[in-house]
């Protein structure tokens, strides 16, 4: 079977398997496009790099995977400052805390560019973040000219728990990562 497998360079969109997977992921998420990367950590890093110019900051939970387990990649590779806020037991960050943490043009601080949430939240007992909560945070992001990213390594667990499609759950977020080795 390996001798009959179709081969191609995915850089030139010649790998049919990758093309089909990316097309399916874009359709499932309701997003314009999708990109296959080797790990969720890399997916998060790519998303942060797209949304955050060097020297800006991202608001994320103090128990988030990106902050806790991704080796400081956003700082090391992107020059992105992480502004950690307290994660509640259910994985949320208090709405008012998010609003209060946003920093605009002030020479003393990095400018906020991104809010990142995790759904479901690994270190917060796997609770799913509701559509209403995501939409509330998306509203804050839009009102402040920020982007909203979802680390969705386990997002399919959230869709099952909430009985909602992925595209509906993330329709108001700017980017979402998901892992093909978890929750399928």
Regions found by a protein language model. Name each.
Residues 1-5, 11-184:
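Conserved PLP-enzyme active-site core in the AAT-like
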């Amino acid at each position: 079977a390996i001798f009959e497998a179709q081969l191609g360079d995915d850089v030139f969109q010649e790998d049919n398997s990758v093309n089909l997977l990316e097309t399916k992921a874009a359709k499932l998420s309701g997003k314009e496009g999708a990109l296959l990367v080797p790990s969720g950590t890399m997916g998060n890093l790519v998303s942060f790099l797209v949304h955050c110019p060097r020297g800006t900051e991202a608001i994320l939970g103090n128990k988030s995977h990106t902050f806790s387990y991704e080796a400081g990649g956003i700082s090391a590779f992107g020059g992105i400052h992480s502004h950690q806020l307290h994660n509640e037991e259910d994985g949320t960050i208090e709405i008012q805390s998010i609003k209060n943490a946003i920093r605009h043009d002030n020479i003393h601080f990095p400018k906020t560019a991104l809010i990142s949430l995790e759904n479901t939240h690994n270190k917060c007992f796997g609770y799913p973040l509701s559509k209403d909560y995501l939409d509330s945070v998306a509203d804050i992001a839009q009102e402040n000219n920020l982007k909203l990213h979802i680390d969705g390594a386990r997002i399919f667990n959230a869709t099952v728990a909430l009985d909602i499609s992925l595209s509906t759950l993330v329709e108001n977020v700017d980017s979402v990562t998901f892992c093909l080795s978890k929750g399928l």
